[in-house]
């Protein structure tokens, strides 16, 4: 018979300890740790719908409301949700991210780039394609396409400044809060294990 040594591998310990400690947290704190990325995704979806609406008004697009609103809500939601989960929540819960500033910075970057800027940039080709298809707005000739879209996009970026900053601040706060909740969970005493 082989002597069976207990696993002292750091990864095994972390994968066993962190989920067990998180289960000891109150339900509201546990939900924030587990579903925080969905909140970031929902904010990104709302940002996508707002950007879609602003571009539709500027380009005078009145047809295909659902055809443009559906991808402008679903794609930013999925992108921001999965990115925040991959870059912030998952590394936190596996012990690969152990610095509050790092967590806040990652959350801020995901919130700004994928929750704020990405929905605005995604709205440009969606609504540009609809404007070309329904001929609701005169589109530029080949030489000045870039200048045309910059001119069209400036008012949208100005109006989307507050939602983008709000998304960025919320993602930074959520990253910091998730880190503090994880530290709180790790400081909880070990539950009494009954020996049978």
Swiss-Prot record:
Q: Which UniProt keywords apply?
A: Membrane, Mitochondrion, Mitochondrion inner membrane, Transmembrane, Transmembrane helix
Superkingdom to which the source organism belongs: Eukaryota
Show which residues sit on the Mitochondrial intermembrane side of the membrane. Answer: 56-57, 128-159
Membrane spanning residue stretches: 35-55, 58-78, 107-127, 160-176
Cellular component GO terms, alphabetical: mitochondrial inner membrane; mitochondrion; plasma membrane
Q: How does it sit in the membrane?
A: Multi-pass membrane protein
Stored InterPro entries: TMEM126
Side of membrane Mitochondrial matrix, spans: 1-34, 79-106, 177-196
Location in the cell reads: Mitochondrion inner membrane
GO biological process assignments: mitochondrial protein quality control; mitochondrial respiratory chain complex I assembly; optic nerve development; protein insertion into mitochondrial inner membrane from matrix; toll-like receptor 4 signaling pathway
Stated role = Protein required for the cotranslational protein quality control in the inner membrane of the mitochondria. Associates with newly synthesized polypeptides and may act as a chaperone that cooperates with OXA1L for the insertion of newly synthesized mitochondrial proteins into the inner membrane. Required for the assembly of the ND4 module of mitochondrial complex I.
Similarity comment: Belongs to the TMEM126 family.
Subunit relationships: Interacts with OXA1L; promoting cotranslational quality control in mitochondria.
Protein name, UniProt field: Transmembrane protein 126A
